[in-house]
């Protein structure tokens, strides 16, 4: 999705999928099945101590997603912002791409460990953070990432704000769409 160059984001993970392992994922009834299949593939080929990115293209039976509206504040948690601005969506029977990023357990704190997924429709008009999805068959491209770059905010407020207030339960609520 395109935005103005001046549009900011509070947090983003970006990567290129050039190469890697390509395979077909057959019937995935829910997001737990998708995460399990991806985890098995990285255990087979790479091991679980690296970051991985997957691009899954196909026709999705259902995608439950959410997106938070823009919100300007330096001292409100993601959970609190989402409780005020989040919109939930249920997309049915559409083509699109599921982008999945895996962080190993030891990187918890830089990002929530495990799989984090976003969806964008083929026409780039629909999308969001995914907490449920299913498809009959889709093509997956899975790649190990060998580096990360972290850009920290330049604002003074960042240096004085307590960043470790979120509990594991709160992070799970946000990730799974329960918050």
Located regions from the model:
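Hydrophobic alpha-helical segments and helix pairs
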Residues: 1-42
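Long, positively charged binding patches that form subdomain-scale interaction surfaces
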Residues: 28, 32-110
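A generic structural signal for well-ordered coil/turn residues at beta-strand boundaries
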Residues: 50, 92-94, 111-113, 126, ...
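Short, solvent-exposed amphipathic alpha-helical segments in soluble enzyme
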Residues: 70-72, 115-116, 134-135
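Mature extracellular or lumenal effector domains of secreted proteins
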Residues: 96, 125-126, 174-177
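Histidine-centered divalent-metal-coordination microenvironment in nucleic-acid enzymes
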Residues: 112-120
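A hydrophobic, small-residue-rich beta->alpha segment in the mid-to-C-terminal subdomain
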Residues: 121-166
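Conserved catalytic alpha/beta cores of large enzymes that bind or transform nucleotide phosphates
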Residues: 163-179
């Amino acid at each position: 999705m395109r935005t103005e160059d001046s549009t900011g984001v509070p947090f983003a993970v970006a990567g290129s999928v050039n190469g890697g392992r390509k395979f077909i994922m057959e019937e995935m009834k829910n997001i737990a099945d998708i995460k399990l299949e991806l985890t098995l593939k990285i255990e087979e080929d790479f091991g679980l101590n690296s970051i991985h990115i997957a691009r899954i293209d196909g026709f999705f039976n259902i995608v439950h997603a959410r997106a938070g509206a823009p919100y300007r504040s330096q001292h409100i948690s993601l959970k609190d912002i989402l409780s005020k601005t989040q919109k939930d969506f249920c997309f049915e029977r559409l083509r699109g791409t599921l982008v999945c990023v895996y962080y190993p357990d030891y990187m918890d704190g830089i990002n929530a460990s495990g799989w984090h997924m976003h969806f964008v429709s083929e026409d780039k008009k629909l999308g969001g953070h995914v907490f449920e999805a299913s498809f009959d068959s889709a093509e997956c491209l899975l790649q190990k990432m060998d580096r990360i770059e972290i850009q920290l905010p330049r604002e003074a407020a960042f240096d004085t704000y307590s960043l470790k207030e979120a509990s594991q339960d709160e992070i799970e609520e946000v990730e799974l769409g329960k918050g």
